[in-house]
């Protein structure tokens, strides 16, 4: 296809901020599998985007044998001067359609301390969170817990609310409240309306700080919806936030793509936040 982004590999893919800041992102890479990662145009851009983060959540991973993930990791490690590793959930879903949560992380910055699959006793989630505790020695908290969610669109209100139960479960299990909830919550437009927010505990409780505003547009297409979100809890982690760093990463502009080219990669933009390190 001869896309025009080739010269833009430079700074973003090198992850140069990693020594002075911790950048975390969440990216719903629509229907990520062998076809997408092996497409030289799509695979290269996805790898470059992910190599810009110290820790990144990838959603809509449909790759039970990890063949696409293995190729993705090769591509990330080829474009970055740093070595990346990954940890993933099992395929999740109530019916034949299943997705995996995938975290990729820069090995010299972060390491996996522990993981667990939220047991979901009330069957609140279509794809229950795969909870990961990372060690990040350069961060003030030293450890932080990442809780991913790709919410089923028409159950988004109930699923976002149920993240409060995951919050309590993590506190009970690991005795920490330094958590980052992130992913495609489908938290806007026809799935979550203004009158729904008061009933969502993750939103109504002052324990949580929502970093991506309702006014954001995290979609690549013509819609204007803040589907993808990042929510932080824990006094230590909140104090470590780099002010005004939470944002939507518009890779269409970054790589100078037209909308058709961008939509071939995903119908979502990544969302991201940066934490101060020492």
From Swiss-Prot:
Can you name a GO cellular component term? Answer: extracellular region
Q: Where is the signal peptide?
A: 1-21
Record protein name field: Deoxyribonuclease-1-like 2
Intracellular or extracellular location(s)? Cytoplasm; Secreted
Species annotation: Mus musculus (Mouse)
Q: Name one GO molecular function term.
A: metal ion binding
| Cofactor(s) required, per the database record | Mg(2+); Ca(2+)
Q: Which CDD domains match?
A: DNase1
Pfam families cross-referenced by the UniProt entry: Exo_endo_phos (PF03372)
Recorded hits in InterPro entries, A to Z, give: Deoxyribonuclease-1_AS, DNase_I, DNASE_I_2, Endo/exonu/phosph_ase_sf, Endo/exonuclease/phosphatase
**Which residues does the Swiss-Prot or TrEMBL record annotate as the active site?**
99, 150
The Swiss-Prot or TrEMBL record describes its family as follows: Belongs to the DNase I family.
Q: Which gene encodes it?
A: Dnase1l2
Q: PROSITE patterns in the record, alphabetically?
A: DNASE_I_1, DNASE_I_2
GO process terms (BP): corneocyte development; DNA catabolic process; hair follicle development
- Major subcellular site: cytoplasm
Its annotated function is as follows: Divalent cation-dependent acid DNA endonuclease involved in the breakdown of the nucleus during corneocyte formation of epidermal keratinocytes. May play an immune role by eliminating harmful DNA released into the extracellular environment by damaged epidermal cells.
Disulphide-bonded residues: 189-225
Q: Give the Enzyme Commission number.
A: 3.1.21.-
Mind listing the UniProt keywords for this protein, alphabetically?
Calcium, Cytoplasm, Disulfide bond, Endonuclease, Hydrolase, Magnesium, Metal-binding, Nuclease, Secreted, Signal
């Amino acid at each position: 296809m001869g896309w025009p982004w080739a010269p833009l590999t430079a700074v973003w893919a090198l992850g140069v901020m990693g020594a002075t800041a911790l950048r975390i992102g969440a990216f719903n890479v629509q229907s990520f599998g062998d076809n997408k990662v092996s497409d030289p145009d799509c695979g290269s851009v996805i790898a470059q985007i992910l190599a810009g983060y110290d820790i990144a959540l990838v959603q809509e991973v449909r790759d039970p044998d990890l063949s696409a993930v293995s190729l993705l990791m090769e591509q990330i490690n080829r474009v970055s001067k740093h070595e990346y590793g990954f940890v993933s959930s099992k395929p999740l879903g109530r019916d034949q359609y299943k997705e995996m949560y995938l975290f990729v992380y820069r090995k010299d910055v972060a390491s996996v301390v522990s993981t667990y699959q939220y047991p979901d006793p009330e069957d609140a989630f279509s794809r229950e969170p795969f909870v990961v505790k990372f060690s990040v020695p350069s961060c003030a908290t030293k450890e932080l817990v990442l809780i991913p969610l790709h919410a089923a669109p028409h159950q988004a209100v109930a699923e976002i609310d149920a993240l409060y139960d995951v919050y309590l479960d993590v506190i009970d299990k690991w005795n920490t409240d330094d958590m980052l909830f992130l992913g495609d919550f489908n938290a806007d437009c026809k799935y979550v309306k203004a009158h729904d927010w008061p009933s969502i505990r993750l939103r109504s409780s002052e324990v949580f700080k929502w970093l991506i505003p309702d006014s954001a547009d995290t979609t690549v297409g013509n819609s204007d919806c803040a589907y993808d979100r990042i929510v932080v809890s824990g006094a230590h982690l909140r104090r470590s936030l780099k002010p005004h760093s939470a944002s939507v990463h518009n890779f269409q502009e970054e790589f100078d793509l037209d909308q058709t080219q961008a939509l071939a990669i995903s119908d979502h933009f990544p969302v991201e936040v940066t934490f101060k390190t020492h």
